[in-house]
């Protein structure tokens, strides 16, 4: 897997915040986010990269801006976690089960600034996070446990 290859490299987190997404997907939010952050000197905005360059760039940053896509979340959030980069997402009820993962939740994109990123990174950089929730085996076991509980409580 390409992400495994990139994860096997010792990539320094030289950039603070990475931004790479298609503004034509869920334009109502993404265009505003792009316009708001593309000129910030602490954000690296890019587009139209090969998958390998995209993953490498993401892995070399501490954070990645991950606005929702066609659905209520975005593949970038999960790719970022896998690449040990902290995704920044809008807080929503569908993400309540993931507050124990290294994700920076914002209620509004206007909350995002250089100081907030630095402070958040300081609080999480040396913490251990159990990323089992990213594995299908975790969810299969949760479903089996729930099924067994239902059968026992009949």
Language-model segments: residues:
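Nucleotide-sugar donor-binding catalytic core of glycosyltransferases
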Residues: 1-78, 82-105, 116-154
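Active-site donor-binding loop signature of nucleotide-sugar glycosyltransferases
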Residues: 107-109
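GIY-YIG nuclease catalytic motif and its immediate N-terminal context
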Residues: 113
């Amino acid at each position: 897997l390409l992400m495994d290859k990139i994860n096997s490299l010792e990539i320094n987190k030289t950039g603070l915040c990475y931004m790479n997404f298609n503004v034509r997907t869920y334009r109502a939010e993404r265009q505003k986010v792009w316009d708001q952050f593309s000129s910030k000197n602490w954000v690296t905005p890019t587009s139209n990269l090969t998958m390998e360059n995209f993953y490498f760039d993401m892995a070399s940053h501490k954070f990645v801006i991950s606005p929702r896509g066609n659905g209520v979340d975005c593949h970038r959030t999960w790719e970022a976690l896998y690449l040990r980069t902290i995704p920044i997402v809008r807080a929503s009820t569908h993400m309540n089960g993931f507050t124990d993962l290294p994700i920076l939740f914002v209620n509004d994109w206007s909350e995002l600034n250089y100081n907030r990123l630095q402070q958040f990174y300081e609080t999480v950089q040396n913490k251990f996070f159990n990323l089992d929730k990213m594995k299908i085996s975790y969810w299969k076991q949760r479903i089996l446990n729930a099924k067994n509980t239902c059968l026992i409580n009949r």
